Amino acid sequence: MQRYEFAQLDSTAGVPCPCGTSRRAFFKPENVLATTHLVEISADARTHYHKRLTETYVILEGEGFLELDGERIPVKPLSTIMIRPGCRHRAVGKMKVLNFVVPAFDPEDEWFD
């Protein structure tokens, strides 16, 4: 078994998500460790949270805000934010974000108030 995996995020099919469109690398049932997402936020995202997942956002393009438990944080390229389980969050503004998710993304762990 190979001890590495390779993905080309710009060639990965986009899927709708609460933040806009997400291209998900390493998203498969046998992978429980981590996933990497390229997220294009074209409008204000829907507030949501995760009970198990920790997300780390790296802003690649655009400027705007991340709302984290009701606090509005200004972000710009290379701003990096770790979002722990239970933190209600959403992006506000048009941005491209690299999102590292640990453990691997689980669509059943997206919660809305």
Regions found by a protein language model. Give the residues of each.
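Conserved short histidine dyad/triad with adjacent acidic residue
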Residues: 35-51
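Short glycine/proline-enriched turns and hinge-like loops at secondary-structure junctions
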Residues: 50-52, 93-94
